[in-house]
Amino acid sequence: MRVPFIIPDGGGFVKLDAGWIFRYHGPDDEVMTMQYLCAPMEGVTGDLFRQAQRQTFPAADSYYTLFLSPTANRTFSPRELREIEPAHNAGIRVVPQLMGHCAEDFLWMAGQLADMGYDEVNFNLGCPSNTVTVKKKGAGLLTEPDLLRRFFDAVFAACPL
C-alpha cells in the first residue's frame, strides 16, 4: 500500500499528493475528527473517478467538482451536467465548485444546484491560471475588492444554499 506524502499548508489543511485534503475540527484541537475531502484535479477526479474510488476504497466525506462557471446565458455545458448529474454521484457527497464574478449568474446556478438536491457550493477564489484571472475569476477577483464585496453582499443576501 502506498502512503501519500503529506504537506502541511499552515492553515489547518493538509494536502496530499493525490489531491486529498484533511480538515481538522474540534474545540481547541483537543478532540479532532478528520474529514477526507477530495479536491478537484482536472482530467482525474471526475464523476467516473468518484464512483470508482467509492467502490474500491472507503468514500471521502466530500468530493469537490472542477469549477462550474455560471454565465449570462444561464445554461450548463455538457461537461458541467455530467459532473453534477445526481445519478452520476449516487451514494457520495459532491460539492459543486463555482467560479465567476457576476452575483446574478452565481445565484442562478446556486438555485439550479439547490433544485438538484445540493446543499452546499464552494466558491473558487484561488485559481491562479492567467486564462481565468484575466476574466476576473478565481484569484483574479481578489484584485477587485469592491467588486468582490458587492458580489458577496448580493450572494449572502439571496443564496438558497
What is the meaning of each model-derived region?
Residues 43-112:
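Glycine-rich, positively charged N-terminal anion/phosphate-binding segment
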Residues 58-60, 118, 160:
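A structural motif
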Residues 33-36:
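Extreme N-terminal starter segment of soluble prokaryotic enzymes
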Residues 65, 119-128:
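Non-cysteine beta-strand/loop elements that form the S-adenosyl-L-methionine
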Residues 5-7, 25, 29:
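Short terminal hydrophobic/aromatic SLiMs and anchors at protein ends
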